[in-house]
Amino acid sequence: RCKNNLRQIGIAIHNLNTSTGFFVDGGKDWWSARSMQGSTPRMAPHQNWGWLYQILPAMEVNNLYHFQPDYKIRRTPVEGYFCPSRRPPSVLGGLRAVNDYAGNGGVCGQGGGLSDWGEGKSGVIVRGGYTPKVTFETVTDGSTHTILVGEKALHPDHYNLFSISDNEGYTSGWD
């Protein structure tokens, strides 16, 4: 089922790329409210929330994408964002629904993590608000040789804890 979830996520991202001409992004930051234009959520590069939020309509979770208020969206887990062999859909501390998948944000420095200020801009799903839109043309190694999304690295002892690499929830787009 994990492979199927990754396949569905990949198809959702590609479908959005086909309709917009660019890839979803990693969102701007974890503390910002969702970007709206009237009552409609905005898309990358104008959406503060991350790629897993941005693909909800293509994952057939359109009702959650348009739901109000924001805090209820943050607390609602999406079944397709969890690998069943890892853990069930989870909400950490009753605050944020987490996920088991990570987007390719690019290379990172010796510390191993991407800064929330836009470093590591060489990936496909980069931080929003800091870099230009990523298109198939800007993927210099070619899309067949580039990882888009994968299972995120997380120690099993941290699956249901506030681990630094698993504490922001799927709406932030970078954890």
Segments predicted by a language model, with ranges:
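Internal low-complexity, small-residue/proline-rich segments
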Residues: 1-175
